[in-house]
Regions:
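Glycine-rich phosphate/pyrophosphate-binding beta-alpha loops
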Residues: 17-21, 95-98, 233
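Charged, amphipathic alpha-helical oligomerization/scaffolding segments
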Residues: 106, 113, 145, 149-152, ...
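C-terminal helix-coil-helix/basic helical segment that borders enzyme active sites and/or dimer interfaces
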Residues: 152-196, 206-214
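Glycine-rich flavin
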Residues: 1-22
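A short core secondary-structure module
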Residues: 17-51
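Glycine-rich beta->alpha junctions and the first turn(s) of the following alpha-helix
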Residues: 58-154
Length: 265
């Protein structure tokens, strides 16, 4: 909450999912002002009263520092407070598109790493199709599917950013009608993308083991990290809700929500 004390603004409260805050110099915090308006507040991570705790213990995205942050009467410069409605309107879609891009990166990394393991592998199965696994057509098919999944995810992510660019241009042109339309379309494109890209990369992160052997499950290789990271990212904003929102727009013309928030009942 943002409150006024002795003529000076102060920020107080706690939140979880402070992704990246541990590595940042500044953080952007959503809060309510005394008029119960939603505002965006920017503070330094080393300001008095700011405490970032490294307590994220999820099984994936382990280095994202997505843990707890406490703000205890943190002094706030009035210049660093803006109404949420005055931020760039396509910000939710912009931030969500980062998840799609990250999933794409996971897909590319797992495809490349799997191909490398297959190329170097010397052991084979008696029921295989070639003396070397690198020449086994069934194994090559698996690797090809992994690479194709990563490519498809990347193409979808690029399409997302084109929609965001159109929203950005409408924002620069100060065209309210065009902006509202472009923001809604960007939100929908990102929502549609997340459901498909999540499916592609989560599946690929399990399928990669079909191209390898039981030794691929050894902990030092860490190949399970691709699934853990993809699954964690895809759980951040449940894709079942994204599909419902897209369907509601397709059937009823209902625009997507302007903000994504997590709260308690």
């Amino acid at each position: 909450r943002l409150s006024l004390h002795g003529g000076h603004w102060q920020l107080s409260g706690s939140k979880f999912y402070t992704t990246g805050a541990l590595y940042a110099d500044w953080v952007d915090v959503s809060a309510n002002n005394p008029d119960e308006q939603r505002v965006s507040v920017t503070v330094r991570t080393n300001d008095p009263g700011v405490e970032i705790i490294d307590d994220w213990n999820g099984f994936g995205q382990t280095l994202t520092a997505s843990g707890t942050a406490h703000f205890r009467e943190v002094p706030v410069d009035p210049l660093n407070v803006i109404l949420a409605e005055n931020r760039f309107r396509y910000s939710p879609a912009f931030f969500q598109s980062v998840h799609t891009a990250t999933l794409t990166g996971i897909g590319r990394a797992l495809a490349e790493e799997t191909a490398g393991h297959v190329a170097r592998r010397t052991r084979s199965f008696s029921s295989g199709n070639a003396p070397r696994v690198a020449h086994d057509p069934q194994v090559l098919q698996v690797v090809g599917n992994l690479r194709s999944a990563a490519y498809a995810a990347g193409a979808i992510a690029a399409q997302n950013f084109q929609a965001l660019e159109r929203a950005h241009q409408a924002h620069l042109n100060d065209d309210e009608h065009a902006l509202s339309h472009a923001v809604n379309i960007a939100e929908l494109e990102v929502a549609q993308s997340q459901t498909i890209v999540s499916d592609l990369i989560i599946k690929a992160s399990g399928d990669l083991f079909d191209a390898l052997s039981a030794s691929a499950t050894l902990k030092p290789l860490g190949l399970d990290r691709f699934w853990r990271n993809a699954r964690t990212l895809s759980s951040h904003n449940p894709r079942i809700y994204k599909s419902r929102i897209v369907g509601d727009f397709a059937v009823n013309g209902t625009p997507p929500p302007a903000q994504w928030r997590i709260g308690v009942a």
